[in-house]
Amino acid sequence: MATKNITVRNIPLADIQPSTLNPRKTFDQDSLNELAESIKENGLVQPITLRKTPKGSEKHFEIVCGERRYRASILAGLDNIQAVVKDLDDKKAFAAMIIENLQRKDVDPMEEAAAFSKLFTDGTMKVKEIAKMLGKSQSYVISRINLANIIPQFVELMND
């Protein structure tokens, strides 16, 4: 199997913006503070993944994977962050975001539901494809898509 050489670059934090595609919307401040302390003490263990922004954008790069590490690096007072820059369209970037976020144990069910629903309702992927890509059962994916379609007022109550 062929492997690609991956180049890790040092990118100024000021040149990076979070992605509006990121299904993760909540970040625990205490956890970010702990990660910032760890980064100060030990450095960044894993580089973040970026993609270039379209010409004319205020920032040069958009976060694909690693927004939590990005936020913690800012809290740690760093100027630069180690990153891998990939050439990804919206579909591939969104899929990478979902895959990375599902590796966490504390995935918010509503964020996961919104991400699955977006892939499905945009016509981007079928349930079977989402399940295969994420290593989940089709019934699990369907239940999350259904969760995303519950009454908006109920979602608001759950998030409070």
Can you say where each PLM-predicted feature lies in the sequence?
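Amphipathic, charge-rich alpha-helical segments that serve as recognition/docking helices
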Residues: 71-160
